[in-house]
Amino acid sequence: MKKKNIYSIRKLGVGIASVTLGTLLISGGVTPAANAAQHDEAQQNAFYQVLNMPNLNADQRNGFIQSLKDDPSQSANVLGEAQKLNDSQAPKADAQQNNFNKDQQSAFYEILNMPNLNEAQRNGFIQSLKDDPSQSTNVLGEAKKLNESQAPKADNNFNKEQQNAFYEILNMPNLNEEQRNGFIQSLKDDPSQSANLLSEAKKLNESQAPKADNKFNKEQQNAFYEILHLPNLNEEQRNGFIQSLKDDPSQSANLLAEAKKLNDAQAPKADNKFNKEQQNAFYEILHLPNLTEEQRNGFIQSLKDDPSVSKEILAEAKKLNDAQAPKEEDNNKPGKEDNNKPGKEDNNKPGKEDNNKPGKEDGNKPGKEDNKKPGKEDGNKPGKEDNKKPGKEDGNKPGKEDGNKPGKEDGNGVHVVKPGDTVNDIAKANGTTADKIAADNKLADKNMIKPGQELVVDKKQPANHADANKAQALPETGEENPFIGTTVFGGLSLALGAALLAGRRREL
């Protein structure tokens, strides 16, 4: 009987121990899971609230968030510390100036930190608080209801990947505000894409990182330099293009093209560049024959630099041109004063004193005393006294007496430019070339001529062509034969001329 009782007590003890152990095992398996869920929820709540505390600076906020990540079990304590610090840093002056009572301030603060309101909703509630502070409690109640109704479901809450992506994107230094906000919004919209969004954000951040070589790549530097030297941009336009280059160096080529287009569009028109006086001076200086290229270029540059002194510059250029003009030996222009007939017997402006009519010395019409042949009063054709060759006084070709303005005495003419004339047309009409006319007249540009301008034109006529024509025009007298002309008609003409001169002297 005693043994049976001992066995029963032992059996009861084993049973109690088994039940106790089972209870402990069951309790130990459930408690950690529940605790983990609670910690996660507390961490998320603390994370949201810390992010939206307006009086924390970036370093403080990042420190609290890092603490939440390191030990989620301390979320409540971390949140408490953050709230204390946030409250202690709240601006006092603003609260006093805005005359917000305690209810209004509390509602204002809570609404600012409601994570599920969008910006329009948040701003609407805040405006209602400002409009009627006495309704602060009611406004706050409505805001809380809306915030809770828009709260993400438990399965859509921010998981660890999303939180990590959110934190990293916030601290990427090369993203601008618009880019950063875009990635954060994408994280909120679809947390399942957190890894992909973080990867994209990192790529963009790296691509926008400043380069080690002065931040500007080659294209950007080139565009920067060219835009600085575009003369027709104003300061505002130039600064705008430069700022755009800094903001996005990848668009350097496009920005430079736009700047060039604008510069060309604003370039002064040709007819506005030079005023009338400047154009006239420019043209005249180009055609001053005695200036060197260096002198001509100097005057033209001065005209460009200051069009307002065009008259003075032109006057100086003319003075220098006149001073450098070649001196004339006989102070006459050959072939002009004698109507292009060289070799008159008086060797000085032949034909001018007697109104260009040969034979005037005896007061009669030319050629009457010598068988109706003009110029017979001296027994020879003009220029015969120097061995029958007109213009031979100096043993040179006709018209060469003073070495100036070639071609005046040898059949060359002066062409006065008419409206519509071109150098090529003048050259064709006179049997010469445009280059020859340009060279004879020292034209800087053979296309730059103006109406009224006189051009020396080489007509390509042999020097003795006129004499040959005259000789052929008198075949019946035999004057084309030098011997007959000298012995017979020459003698008679000399005798008759001498008699007439003697008679005229007696009359005088």
Swiss-Prot record:
It holds the Pfam family LysM. Residues 318-412 have a biased composition (Basic and acidic residues). A motif (YSIRK-G/S signaling motif) lies at residues 7-18. GO terms for molecular function: immunoglobulin binding. Sequence repeats lie at residues 333-340, 341-348, 349-356, 357-364, 365-372, 373-380, 381-388, 389-396, 397-404, 405-412. Immunoglobulin-binding region C repeats lie at residues 270-327. Immunoglobulin-binding region A repeats lie at residues 154-211. Immunoglobulin-binding region D repeats lie at residues 93-153. SMART domains: LysM. Immunoglobulin-binding region B repeats lie at residues 212-269. Residues 1-36 form the signal peptide. It is found in: Secreted, Cell wall; Secreted. A motif (LPXTG sorting signal) lies at residues 474-478. Disruption phenotype: Host antibody-secreting cells proliferate in the bone marrow survival niches and sustain long-term antibody titers. In addition, osteogenesis is not inhibited and normal expression of alkaline phosphatase, type I collagen, osteopontin and osteocalcin is observed. One of its GO terms (cellular component) is extracellular region. Keywords: Cell wall, Peptidoglycan-anchor, Repeat, Secreted, Signal, Virulence. Plays a role in the inhibition of the host innate and adaptive immune responses. Possesses five immunoglobulin-binding domains that capture both the fragment crystallizable region (Fc region) and the Fab region (part of Ig that identifies antigen) of immunoglobulins. In turn, Staphylococcus aureus is protected from phagocytic killing via inhibition of Ig Fc region. In addition, the host elicited B-cell response is prevented due to a decrease of antibody-secreting cell proliferation that enter the bone marrow, thereby decreasing long-term antibody production. Interacts with host TNFRSF1A; this interaction leads to the stimulation of both surface expression and shedding of TNFRSF1A. Belongs to the immunoglobulin-binding protein SpA family. Each of the immunoglobulin-binding region repeats can bind the Fc region of an immunoglobulin. This is Immunoglobulin G-binding protein A. The gene is spa.
